[in-house]
């Protein structure tokens, strides 16, 4: 087997395959004859300074449903350094578990190719990043002040969308 890739992803049975870039990347890797392994962030860990994971060899096929697209073998222990490329593809929210995963990935730096740099994932907030492109965003306010939110809502003339800076809102 040629190139060995580890995809750190959401549970495979929850991927929306149509338009999912992680799935497209896995399909292309499979088409090239490369080895695909998958794991979730809770499968990452450290042994001393060595980043490790429990990952499943994964056969990827073109399909419309995850049950048809993925065939996985049982999880087995691996060092991240044993993979040629490690792709952090876990969707936000950026929560404590996500942050811990990026800290673990830092221990693989220089030992394998990390796609989606862990430092960059931590530093670029998913909700604030879009504000670098004001011509593409609706009027926006970032605040912890309820009074400012009410004032902004009045200025906008009604309903607004409110999101937490980190994680997901619990409704």
Predicted features and spans:
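Active-site nucleotide/adenylate-binding loops and adjacent lid/helix of ATP-dependent enzymes
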Residues: 2-31, 36-170
């Amino acid at each position: 087997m040629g190139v060995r890739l580890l995809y750190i992803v959401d549970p495979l049975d929850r991927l929306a395959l149509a338009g999912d870039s992680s799935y497209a990347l896995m399909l292309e890797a499979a088409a090239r004859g490369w080895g695909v392994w998958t794991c979730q962030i809770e499968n990452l860990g450290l042994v001393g300074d060595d980043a490790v994971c429990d990952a499943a060899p994964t056969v990827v096929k073109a399909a419309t449903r995850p049950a048809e697209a993925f065939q996985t073998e049982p999880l087995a222990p691996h060092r991240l350094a044993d993979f040629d490329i490690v792709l952090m593809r876990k969707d936000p929210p950026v929560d404590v578990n996500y942050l811990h995963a990026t800290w673990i990935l830092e221990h693989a730096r220089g030992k394998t190719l990390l796609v989606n740099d862990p430092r960059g994932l931590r530093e670029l907030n998913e909700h604030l990043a879009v504000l670098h492109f004001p011509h593409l965003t609706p009027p926006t306010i970032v605040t912890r002040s309820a009074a400012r939110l009410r004032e902004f809502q009045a200025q906008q003339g009604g309903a607004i969308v409110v999101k937490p800076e980190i994680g997901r809102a619990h409704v």
